[in-house]
Amino acid sequence: MCEKYDVAIIGGGVIGSSVAHFLAERGHKVAIVEKQSIASEASKAAAGLLGVQAEWDAYNPLFELARESRAIFPQLAAVLREKTGIDIGYEEKGIYRIAQNEDEKERILHIMDWQQKTGEDSYFLTGDHVREKEPYLSESII
C-alpha cells in the first residue's frame, strides 16, 4: 500500500491528534504515526495540568509558547465537546508554590516578580491565608 500524505505527524497523543485534526479540517491529508494506540503514552500519564507558571523558576523563551498554548486551550476544549460530546472538564484554577523556609520564600518571590513583569497574575499568600483555602496543609508553610 502506497499512500501519499501532505503531512506526517509523529505521535498520536493529545498534541499530535489535535494538530492532525485541525490540519485535516483545512484540507490536508494527514497520517499519524504512533507506536501504540492513540493517547497511550505521555497523554495517558499526564495529570492534565497547564502549569505554565509552575514550569520555570526563571524566564525562559518557552514560557511564551506555553502561554500561547494555554490561551487557546479553552477553544480546543469547546471544539472537542462540540464535535465529540466529550467534556474534559476544563477549569482555570491556578496553582500554589509552597515555602517552608525563608530561602524557599525568596525563591518564590523572585519567580513571582518576573512573572508579574510578563503580565501574569502572580501574588504571594501567607501560610495562614493558604490554610484558609486548604486547611490540611502543614503548619510549617510560611
For each feature predicted by the language model, list its residue ranges:
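Short, intrinsically disordered, charge-balanced linker/junction segments flanking boundaries
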Residues: 138-142
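Accessory recognition modules or surfaces
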Residues: 2-8, 41-46, 51
